[in-house]
């Protein structure tokens, strides 16, 4: 492994689950939860995500620290912050750079995930939150993930990167960035 590859492989930070939410239907309001079951190839219980191994967007994650960044880019005051449910992601994580999870598997609570790509903003966010939202969220929208091992996720659970296994016959999916 080159020195650069070693730097990419070493993720010493651990994250923490700060918020959990599901959408029972596509345009429904987010439901905030204290715990949720992540189901292999199906996403989160109660979320409208399409089941199946080919769905690369079973679970969406955003970085807690980016909520303030998006709020600032939208010109919001501290008294009117962007809330987790505003950006409609399932899990809000603090303490770890979600971009360091690219091409990696990671554990949250009992569940194991793999990153499948960046979670880009959509036109619906612009309609819901107002003009400029699309540009404010670009680069701060988080990641998409697929559930590899089912398990329960709770508020305050730890987010840990799984060690790289160079002998893995099924390496994590490679993303186009």
Could you describe each region identified by the protein language model?
Residues 1-177:
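Metal-cofactor-dependent catalytic cores
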């Amino acid at each position: 492994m080159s020195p650069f590859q070693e730097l990419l492989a070493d993720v010493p930070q651990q994250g923490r689950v700060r918020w959990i939410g599901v959408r029972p239907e596509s345009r429904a309001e987010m439901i905030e939860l204290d715990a949720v079951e992540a189901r292999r190839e199906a996403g989160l219980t109660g979320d409208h995500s399409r089941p199946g191994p080919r769905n690369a967007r079973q679970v969406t994650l955003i970085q807690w620290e980016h909520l303030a960044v998006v709020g600032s880019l939208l010109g919001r005051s501290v008294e009117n912050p962007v809330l987790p449910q505003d950006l409609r992601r399932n899990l809000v994580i603090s303490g770890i750079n979600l971009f360091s999870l690219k091409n990696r598997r990671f554990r949250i609570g009992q569940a194991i995930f793999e990153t499948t790509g960046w979670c880009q903003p959509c036109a619906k966010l612009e309609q819901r939150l107002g003009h400029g939202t699309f540009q404010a969220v670009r680069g701060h929208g988080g990641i998409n993930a697929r559930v590899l091992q089912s398990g329960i996720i709770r508020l305050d659970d730890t987010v840990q990167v799984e060690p790289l296994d160079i002998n893995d016959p099924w390496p994590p999916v490679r993303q186009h960035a």
